[in-house]
């Protein structure tokens, strides 16, 4: 009986892995991300590609502040697999105050949106965040 359960567990795990997707987001030449609002499922991965120099990814908030991904290096490939549902806010460290922000919505779950809206940002970045939230909600 145990071998059957083990085999079934492997099949279920591999089918979940097989259905996971990877989204690619470029650093653009106009100080933005090529995808500003990414809606993904649990287990999906986002790869940020350094198509233009001087950019990175730094997470400012998410469903569990204590387990946010670390800040990426400038001009470097960066990859994150998302395992918790909720809203994640990230920016480019050098250009965040100018509005280079992105949102990741995992599992179409907005439970922590108020926390994201409460993050201290520059006036320009706050305006961009409001626009990104409108986009995210309109596609939910």
Language model features with spans:
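Extracytoplasmic copper-binding redox domains, predominantly the cupredoxin/blue-copper superfamily
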Residues: 18-140
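Sec-dependent N-terminal signal peptides
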Residues: 4-14
